[in-house]
Amino acid sequence: MGQAAAITMPIDPRNLNTLWSSVLAESFVRLGLQTVVICPGSRSAPLAIAFAEHPEIDAIPILDERSAGFFALGRAKASHRPVALICSSGTAGANFYPAVIEAKESGVPLLVITADRPPELRQCHAGQAIDQLRLFGSYALWEAELALPVLDLGLLRYLRQTAQQAWQQALRGGPVHLNQPLREPLAPIADPATQTWLAQQWPGENFFAELLTAVPTPQIQQPLPPLPSQGLITVGPIAPEDPAAFVQAIAQLSAHLGWPVLSDAVTPLRQFADHCPRLISSYDLILRQPHWRASLQPEAVLQIGELPTSKELRLWLTEQTCPRWIVSPRPENFDPLHGSSHHLPVTVEAIAIPATIAPASDYSRQWQQAETAVQAAIAQHLAQVPDLTEPGIARLLSQHLPAQTPIFVANSTPIRDLEWFWLANDQRRSLYCSRGANGIDGTLSTAIGIAHQNRPSVLITGDLSLLHDSNGFLQRSQLQGHLTVVLIDNSGGGIFELLPIRDCGPSFEPFVATPQTVDFAALCQAYGVDYQAIATEAELIKAIQTLPTSGIRVLHLFTDRRQNAAWRRALFAELAAIPSQS
């Protein structure tokens, strides 16, 4: 055999494990990998070194695997491309599970690589060895146990092609899992046998020439089904890669059909309101008024993606008998109402929309009149309550945060206040929320992942969500960018004050509301995070109109959850009593 090609790429020749791991890293880089989050460990050392030392990878070390998983989730949400996670063997990978679940449920691409003990050290109490096969159950879109590293060109080709398969599966939108068993030596100790084999056998650049990057499959234009004139479009939580194209498609659809658009707060539509004149943002509150609830019944519904967060809307749709067309390229069932639904397996941008524009109908005008009346009632109500109510905070943020700001919204009360009180605007902000599994875990870490290498970003969160993931502050030194945390501290779970459980008796406060006694100023100081207590609306506006460019800052706002719940209930009662002619 002739002389092998020179090694001119990031292939580590020191020993078998470094060679194998660097081939895996280089394969993923060629496929498009840019970011990897690495958790510390010994068994994963060959993988960590290969990915961390690759010149084209942004490698981020994070101590806590749970926090790391959510950071990767946030980075993948913002970049719309797979982010890799690497950890050691044992329970380390299990800590990725909550983020993997959220990634699966919300269609976010993650590439999870867990190091493992070799087969002979499993099921024999060798230590730090658990069953890592199917570690994530049904939540991995695809998974594989990789072969033990071997000096064999055929097996290196297998490794390269398995990497390509994993990447293509992740691009479907969700997590994939590769489990990599490794034998000693785990340190990059030089092995002459590996170097000799490489000198004789390595094919050089030709090895990666066979690696094919994913080619986007062109979507076939989907014609609209026959639809009546009295219908509506709902848009659930979504952060599309091209917000302007997404908004344009829905605006064209609305114009052609003459239908109103009921958009969740976490979509681009409320940030591009000037593009969508039939946008309805206060539908949850409109449907609390009995006359509107009865008179606004549609003859058909186009549901874009998931249903909006609003429970009121979902209950109302359950009462309808009309067909509902669900537009989503994902194959899951997006009908939790179990109604007369039909799946259109495309993106909304792929719908063939005729150029004709429908005139405004009485039905559409009714929705617009209701929207105007409700927004006026909200403004009047907020003018009568003190500074820094939770509804007022949501409204102020929608009015005063800089244009194009990326915003991550915590679950529980914050996302509902955005749904009710966030003003539609034309500020082109990007809103995100973990509405796959709807948990509060990983809130801070996900927000930091979104802020990394991004515009100065904002997290809107309650105290419990922040405390649940306070380890995320450890990522402060890794963050390339800035995150402002708007901390709405109402000393417990404010959402439960709006639910019947609030009347359960003495168990409510300690076991449901679960107030915590934490000095947030001291907590921020311990992590080296900037802290500012906010006491007035004027202070909040001044603090958010211009955002810093680096580091993490907490703006601490104190609210009373019982008073805020009472104000919301009073507003809901006012809206239910609005005269029907409004």
From Swiss-Prot:
Gene3D superfamilies: 3.40.50.970, TPP-binding domain
Keyword Transit peptide in record: no
Classification of source organism: Bacteria, Bacillati, Cyanobacteriota, Cyanophyceae, Synechococcales
Transmembrane segments: none
Subunit annotation: Homodimer.
EC nos: 2.2.1.9
InterPro entries, per the entry: MenaQ_synth_MenD, MenD_middle, THDP-binding, Thiamin_PyroP_enz_TPP-bd_dom, TPP_enzyme_TPP-bd
Alphabetic keyword roster: Magnesium, Manganese, Metal-binding, Thiamine pyrophosphate, Transferase
Catalysed transformations (reactions): isochorismate + 2-oxoglutarate + H(+) = 5-enolpyruvoyl-6-hydroxy-2-succinyl-cyclohex-3-ene-1-carboxylate + CO2
HAMAP family: MenD (MF_01659)
Pathway(s) per entry: Quinol/quinone metabolism; 1,4-dihydroxy-2-naphthoate biosynthesis; 1,4-dihydroxy-2-naphthoate from chorismate: step 2/7; Cofactor biosynthesis; phylloquinone biosynthesis
Name the UniProt record assigns to this protein: 2-succinyl-5-enolpyruvyl-6-hydroxy-3-cyclohexene-1-carboxylate synthase
Note on cofactor: Binds 1 thiamine pyrophosphate per subunit.
Source organism of the structure: Synechococcus elongatus (strain ATCC 33912 / PCC 7942 / FACHB-805)
Required co-factors: Mg(2+); Mn(2+); thiamine diphosphate
Role, per record: Catalyzes the thiamine diphosphate-dependent decarboxylation of 2-oxoglutarate and the subsequent addition of the resulting succinic semialdehyde-thiamine pyrophosphate anion to isochorismate to yield 2-succinyl-5-enolpyruvyl-6-hydroxy-3-cyclohexene-1-carboxylate (SEPHCHC).
NCBIfam families: menD
